[in-house]
């Protein structure tokens, strides 16, 4: 009982972290939002089951279906069964499809495995489930999974799939098999190639009329033989002899969750003949098939791969002003996990880009990780019924504004502080945006170099700055005084690359002020436009004032 309670707690914790808390909607708003998403998913279902086509990626469909279920539970609505096909003309399964319960993580799987023995792991092949019925050694019937009890008659279609054995012998001559019809792939690497919408593609081929040639792009992976041989090894051997060789090749004995994790990771990176979305762990000992019912299989569980992309709810739209004055837009998200990384924010880009995306709080966006693990937006997959977008700040900033603090300059001023403290400029180790905000809020800096005047006592008494850290900061601020002249000029935002600035051989502020446009233009990577920007920069009143202030502080290169 304790083990089962631990598993239940693990699942509930996962669900509460994977799904956001209930939205703060009025009953009327909740009804409207639920109804709209319900109608959209119904339309996708109709397209999928009646037309054999999909207008949405499998992963997006699954996650939005989960989101709908969450909303329905939050507001007391009746929940729906995902992917429930129409049952007109449906055929009864000889043995019900149970489905498979999903484990949240390795710990949950370990708890489940602890009370079981003779366990085996298989790939969770991504396709559509099917029942194959053999009578007197011949394929008698093929039935789609449907609702687990009834499905569509796919016999004629499956008979056209050359990879499915049409005749069998021995123990299989009168048998019922359950498996997955999948899209044949050559060297599919799940980690690199993802799901490629395989499930929808298979469904499309099985639902369309007159496509006998294309059906040969399909095959079947048998994962269950109800009432088959008691020993898994015997089952695998008989299946392989009959032509279902993949089952034997991709079924391995496992003793614990560590071994499952090893195989799962191996198959995630290996070249496989099919698309997968995780692994299934099953006990060799199964109840008699007459006891099988949808949703009640206690002898097998799935551990799915983390989706490459996650659907996330936009909680807020925020605007940031960079050191150059450019306004960027950031979406604040309900937390999602991507490759073991908790993602709560994603950069949208410029205001124009944000307007093109048309993103508002309450929308659902598809987020993945780009190079170096940086979150990016792949798509807007659902827009809320009520959409209120914030007004961006006026575009009054540029590369020569906000060296001195003011209310309207708050964001660009902080961005300048973050820039000058970075490793490539003054190298103020141990302070980031939050630290600069705390210092500025407490000590009300006049300009971007005012921190040079802070005393150890002031730093120690700054809310948000730990006392143990204040001494380190004061030491860093003092060390900055010894940085080369070019580093200070970079901190002032000179519109030159470091390479160009080093090539200029400027060693003093007075020398820099007297340099002409022609001088700057001859530097590597500096054209006439950039040279004019340098002239505008050094003639700016705020820059001159900062230069004089640094001279008074006896910073290297600025002394008279």
From Swiss-Prot:
Q: Which Gene3D superfamilies match?
A: DNA ligase/mRNA capping enzyme, Helix hairpin bin, Nucleic acid-binding proteins
Reaction catalysis annotation? NAD(+) + (deoxyribonucleotide)n-3'-hydroxyl + 5'-phospho-(deoxyribonucleotide)m = (deoxyribonucleotide)n+m + AMP + beta-nicotinamide D-nucleotide
MF terms per GO, please? DNA ligase (NAD+) activity
Q: Which keywords describe this protein according to UniProt?
A: DNA damage, DNA repair, DNA replication, Ligase, NAD
Tell me one GO biological process term: DNA replication
Q: Which Pfam families does the protein's record reference?
A: DNA_ligase_aden, DNA_ligase_OB
Concerning InterPro entries, the annotation shows:
DNA_ligase_AS (IPR018239), DNA_ligase_B (IPR020923), DNA_ligase_CS (IPR033136), DNAligase_adenylation (IPR013839), DNAligase_N (IPR013840), NA-bd_OB-fold (IPR012340), NAD_dep_DNA_ligaseB (IPR050326), NAD_DNA_ligase_OB (IPR004150)
> Does this entry carry the keyword Zinc?
no
Which residues carry out catalysis?
A: 124
Q: Which domain of life is it from?
A: Bacteria
Give its E.C. classification number.
6.5.1.2
Primary role: Catalyzes the formation of phosphodiester linkages between 5'-phosphoryl and 3'-hydroxyl groups in double-stranded DNA using NAD as a coenzyme and as the energy source for the reaction.
Q: Which family does it belong to?
A: Belongs to the NAD-dependent DNA ligase family. LigB subfamily.
Q: Which HAMAP family match?
A: DNA_ligase_B
Q: What is this protein called?
A: DNA ligase B
Q: Which organism is it from?
A: Escherichia coli (strain SMS-3-5 / SECEC)
């Amino acid at each position: 009982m304790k083990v089962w309670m631990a598993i239940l707690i693990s699942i509930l914790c996962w669900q509460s972290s994977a799904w956001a808390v209930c939205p703060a909607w009025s009953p009327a708003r909740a009804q409207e939002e639920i109804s709209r998403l319900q109608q959209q998913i119904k339309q996708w279902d109709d397209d999928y089951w009646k037309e054999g086509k999909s207008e949405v990626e499998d992963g997006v469909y699954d996650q939005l279906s989960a989101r709908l279920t969450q909303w329905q539970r939050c507001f007391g609505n009746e929940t729906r069964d995902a992917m429930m096909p129409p049952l007109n003309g449906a055929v009864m399964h000889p043995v019900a499809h149970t489905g498979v319960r999903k484990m949240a993580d390795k710990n949950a799987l370990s708890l489940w495995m602890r009370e079981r023995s003779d366990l085996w792991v298989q790939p969770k092949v991504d396709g559509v489930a099917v029942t194959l019925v053999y009578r007197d050694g011949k394929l008698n019937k093929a039935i789609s999974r449907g609702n687990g009890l009834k499905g569509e008659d796919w016999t004629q279609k499956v008979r056209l799939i050359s990879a499915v054995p049409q005749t069998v012998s021995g123990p299989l001559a009168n048998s019922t098999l359950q498996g997955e019809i999948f899209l044949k792939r050559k060297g599919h690497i799940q980690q690199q190639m993802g799901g490629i919408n395989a499930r929808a593609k298979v469904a499309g081929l099985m639902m369309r009329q007159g496509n006998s040639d294309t059906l040969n792009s399909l095959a079947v992976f048998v994962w269950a033989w109800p009432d088959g041989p008691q020993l898994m090894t015997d089952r695998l051997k008989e299946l392989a002899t009959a032509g279902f060789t993949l089952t034997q090749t991709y079924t391995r004995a496992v003793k614990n969750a560590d071994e499952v994790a090893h195989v799962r990771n191996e198959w995630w990176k290996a070249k496989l003949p099919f698309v997968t979305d995780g692994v299934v762990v099953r006990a060799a000992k199964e109840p008699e098939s007459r006891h099988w019912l949808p949703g009640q299989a206690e002898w097998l569980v799935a551990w799915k791969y983390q989706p490459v992309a996650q659907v996330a709810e936009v909680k807020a739209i925020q605007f940031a002003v960079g050191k150059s004055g450019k306004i960027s837009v950031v979406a604040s998200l309900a937390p999602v996990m991507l490759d073991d990384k908790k993602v709560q924010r994603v950069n949208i880009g410029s205001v124009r880009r944000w307007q093109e995306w048309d993103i508002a709080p309450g929308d659902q966006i598809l987020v993945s990780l780009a190079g170096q693990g940086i979150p990016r937006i792949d798509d807007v997959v659902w827009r809320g019924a009520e959409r209120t977008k914030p007004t961006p700040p006026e575009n009054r900033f540029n590369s020569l504004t906000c060296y001195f603090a003011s209310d309207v300059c708050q964001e660009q001023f902080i961005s300048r502080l973050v820039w000058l403290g970075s490793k490539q400029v003054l190298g103020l180790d141990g302070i980031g945006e939050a630290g600069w905000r705390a210092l500025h809020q407490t000590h009300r800096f006049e300009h971007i170099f005012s921190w040079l005047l802070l005393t150890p006592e002031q730093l120690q008494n700054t809310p948000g700055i730990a006392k143990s850290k204040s001494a380190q900061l004061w030491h860093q601020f003092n060390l900055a005084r010894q940085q080369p002249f070019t580093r200070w000029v970079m901190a002032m935002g000179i519109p030159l690359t470091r390479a160009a600035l080093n090539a200029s051989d400027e060693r003093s502020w007075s020398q820099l002020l007297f340099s002409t446009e022609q001088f700057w233009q001859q530097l590597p990577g500096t054209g006439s436009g950039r040279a004019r920007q340098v002239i505008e920069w050094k003639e700016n009143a705020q820059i001159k004032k900062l230069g004089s202030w640094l001279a008074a502080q006896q910073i290297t290169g600025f002394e008279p």
